[in-house]
Amino acid sequence: MRDKKLETKLRLVTLQLENWKKLHDLITYGLDKAKPIISTEQERQFTDIRANLLQEIEYVLRELGMLSEASGKAMSVLQRGVSVRGMRELSNDEVRRLETDWNSVFTKLGLMQGQLKARRKELAEQTVFDFYLNR
């Protein structure tokens, strides 16, 4: 048995997680002062990923029922990290807050993905008769 709403939510959370991972890679690169100069291409990638997250995060969190618990931290990360180059100018406290907030959002999205996958597996093992019987 398949649930279209469940599949949609799973797709949404998977895409969000991929974008949060890409954002993390660029943030980490920006914070590493030993790395070479930040390229225009890296800044463009960062801006594109950040724009995608800004456009989609509220919708995705609302669809997943996580708006109240993750929206503030997500916006904190997206507002604090305005460019890869700007990462190098953050104070140690700002970096810690950024990392903590990023981890919080990423963890919540990961947990949601795990719950959705478990529900998908549960549904896959059900027959149509079982599904309607257990409603």
Model-based region annotation:
Residues 1-135:
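Conserved non-transmembrane functional hotspots
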